[in-house]
Swiss-Prot record:
Chain coiled-coil ranges: none
BP terms from Gene Ontology: iron ion transmembrane transport
Name this protein carries in UniProt: Probable metal-nicotianamine transporter YSL4
GO CC, any one term: plant-type vacuole
Origin superkingdom: Eukaryota
UniProt cross-references to InterPro entries, sorted A to Z: OPT, YSL-like
Bilayer topology term: Multi-pass membrane protein
UniProtKB keywords: Membrane, Transmembrane, Transmembrane helix, Transport
Family: Belongs to the YSL (TC 2.A.67.2) family.
Disulfide-linked positions: none
Keyword Transmembrane: yes
Length: 670
């Protein structure tokens, strides 16, 4: 996810209760039995769906919520439906265990994770000719030789050589991070509790209702998306996606509700603070800042420039958004490194500050808890992953990657790739440890760091491509390492084998290396990707290419006062984060998140309206019936997102066949 947000908030507290009700006599299958053919088939189908959803979000707004709940729920639904169907035909089927459910969820998440860390909405597409032309052929540092257009084969090959290294670099530390440090990995813990709840009587009944709820809203979302298509016309300015719900004046400043089930679903999943931060960012930028700068057209920048010219207002939009993102990312990177070092060095602090389960249980339950913990520890450590296997795997893959990547990206020399792999394990540890403490995984922040360093060293002789490729290497390793450790936590709490988790991650990553490029290619061939006036703007492609150019050229060619404004917003992002950490929780939870505020500065205000509608729905629902909201909101939101995502497939096929919508619904002043 480009905008990285805490993910644990999407699961209600009631799902944590089954943790204390572990049945000590339950059968735990061997690690090979936890990985089934039906599970892998379900994972592949769900991986396709979630890759499409991730691409759609990545290419429109760049904010991707966690889909772990939907993956676990739909995995449960697929296998239960399959076993139920076979039983009606008179066939006996293997019992569906929580370990198999965990394997499916892990496989799906590792598969669709590559749709994000693979850079299809950021660093890879930033290399293409459209992004080059959008910035301008006469723009300093934007050279025609720094162009590599997307290709299905080279993108697939690139993913295969970079995506597996992160799985090997931290495997030897799984005992240290899960058992010794007792890192919580809130999203992994919450997902485990959700899966545990599915496989007891009470939880199975609720899960059945959640599946029905998800199916209902998935159908509604699919039908609505199909209905909208008939009015969307040719081009990008027709239909409900451009409905001036707040009036034509505000519509010109991108303030309108576009009836998007995906964005409403995102608003229901994301914390209220994230949605309010996004809306605040939209109000500051499109309500005040851009109109103010527009008044100085002809003074600060030439008045006759095109809307997408970086010498004009467009330059302010992109570079101020970059400044906020970098300020927020730098602060959190330093914060997590400091917390990591402090926690490692201070053993007593680690024991008292980390939320260990024994802290919240009565003394009468201590013996039960100890038996539960002992059983988990035994199962987690039972199937070893040899140290020599992990080390040799990392070294071997790094050697192959060091040889192949310079063939794909000639400006990125082999010694840059080698240096990246030497420092990557340390950065992966920092990110994984930080994710375990705070639930914030920040692969794009580490990637941008590598981007700037490599681009500035290489310079004008291919620095843009080299920086973007280095960003991809770092993002892939750091992201997959954190995901693996989080899945180890999920497996630990569901009595799943660590070896089955690791093998499933390998299988899911292999699926993702094929599925993610194929599903992206569907978008690439069917839609006008990167059109700033279209639906699939690919907003972060321009931002990443500009970052690389900035690393090569410096700040000399920015529009008038742009550097001063960028510095101001960069410092503001640092200060806001510092205030959030220094104030009491009652106050800090009301302070906006700079990273969430940055998106609308460049993309527009319309998706902020949609996401705020989602948060209003949740607030009203929680006020009316909090238990139902806790139980079913995730299913409703996932249904809205999945239904709209499924419609992308027939929509893309119609576009490829040149079948256009029959009606253009358009609005103009009377």
């Amino acid at each position: 996810m480009e905008t990285e947000i805490p993910r644990s908030t999407e699961i209600s507290e009631t799902l944590l209760l089954p943790e204390t009700n572990l049945d000590h006599g339950e059968y735990v299958p061997e690690w090979k039995e936890q990985i089934t053919i039906r599970g892998l088939i379900s994972s592949a189908l769900l991986g396709i769906l979630f890759c499409i959803i991730t691409h759609k979000l990545n290419l429109t707004i760049g904010i991707i919520p966690s889909l772990n709940v939907a993956a676990g729920l739909l995995g449960f639904f697929f296998i239960k439906s399959w076993t139920g169907f076979l039983s009606k035909l008179g066939f006996l089927s293997k019992p569906f265990t929580k370990q198999e459910n965990t394997v499916i969820q892990t496989c799906v998440v590792s598969c669709y994770g590559l749709a994000y860390s693979g850079g299809f909405g950021s660093y890879l597409i930033a290399m293409d000719e459209r992004t080059y032309k959008l910035i301008g052929s006469d723009y300093p540092g934007n050279n025609p030789e720094d162009v590599i257009n997307p290709g299905l084969w080279w993108m697939t090959g690139f993913l295969f050589v970079v995506s597996f290294l992160g799985l090997f670099c931290l495997v030897p530390l799984r005992k240290v991070m899960i058992l010794d440090y007792k890192l919580t990995y809130p999203s992994g813990t919450a997902t485990a509790m959700l899966i545990n709840s599915f496989h007891n009587n009470t939880g199975a009944e609720l899960a059945g209702k959640q599946v029905k709820c998800l199916g209902k809203y998935l159908s509604l979302s699919l039908v609505w998306s199909c209905f909208k298509w008939f009015f969307s016309g040719i081009g990008g300015a027709c239909g409900f996606d451009h409905f001036p719900t707040l009036g034509l004046t505000l519509f010109k400043n991108t303030f309108y509700f576009d009836f998007s089930p995906t964005f409403i679903g995102c608003g229901m999943i994301c914390p209220h603070l994230v949605n309010c931060s996004v809306l605040l960012g939209a109000i500051i930028s499109w309500g005040f800042l851009w109109p103010f700068i527009s008044q100085h057209a002809g003074d600060w920048y030439p008045a006759d420039l095109k809307a997408n010219d970086f010498k004009g207002l467009y330059g302010y939009k992109v570079f101020i958004a970059i400044s906020i993102i970098l300020g927020d990312g730098l602060y959190n990177l330093i914060k997590i490194i400091v917390v990591t070092v402090k926690e490692i060095c201070n053993k007593s602090s680690r024991q008292h500050n980390l939320p260990v389960f024994t802290d919240i249980l009565d003394k009468s339950k201590t013996s039960v808890l100890m038996r539960e913990k002992k059983k988990r520890d035994i199962i987690f450590l039972k199937d070893r992953i040899p140290l020599e296997f992990a080390v040799s795997g990392y070294v071997g893959l790094a050697a192959i990657s060091t040889a192949i990547i310079p063939l794909i990206f000639p400006p990125l020399k082999w010694y840059f790739v080698l240096c990246s792999y030497l420092v990557a394990p340390g950065l992966a540890f920092c990110n994984s440890y930080g994710a375990g403490l705070t639930d914030m995984s920040m692969p794009s922040t580490y990637g941008k760091t590598g981007l700037f360093i490599v681009a500035s060293i290489v310079g004008n002789n291919g620095g843009v491509i080299a920086g973007l490729a280095a960003c991809g290497i770092m993002m892939s390793i750091v992201s997959t390492a954190a995901d693996l450790m989080q899945d180890f936590k999920t497996g630990y709490l569901t009595l799943s084998s660590a070896k089955s988790m690791f093998v499933t991650q390998l299988l899911g990553t292999a699926m993702g290396c094929i599925i993610a490029p194929l599903t992206f290619w569907l978008f690439w061939t069917a839609f006008d990707i990167g059109d700033p006036d279209g639906l699939y703007k690919a907003p972060y492609a321009v931002i990443y290419r500009e970052m690389a150019i900035l690393g090569v050229e410096g700040f000399a060619k920015l529009p008038k006062h742009c550097l001063a404004l960028c510095c101001g917003f960069f410092i503001a992002a640092l200060i806001v984060n510092l205030i959030r950490d220094m104030t009491p929780p009652k106050i800090s939870k009301l302070i906006p998140l700079p990273m969430a505020m940055a998106g609308p500065f460049y993309i527009g205000a319309y998706f902020a309206i949609d996401m705020f509608v989602g948060t209003v729905i949740m607030l009203v629902w929680e006020r009316m019936n909090k238990k139902d909201a806790d139980d079913y909101s995730g299913a409703v939101a996932s249904g809205l997102i999945c239904g709209d995502g499924i419609w992308t497939i027939p929509s893309a096929i119609l576009s490829i066949l040149r079948i256009n919508p029959p009606i253009c619904m358009y609005f103009r002043p009377s």
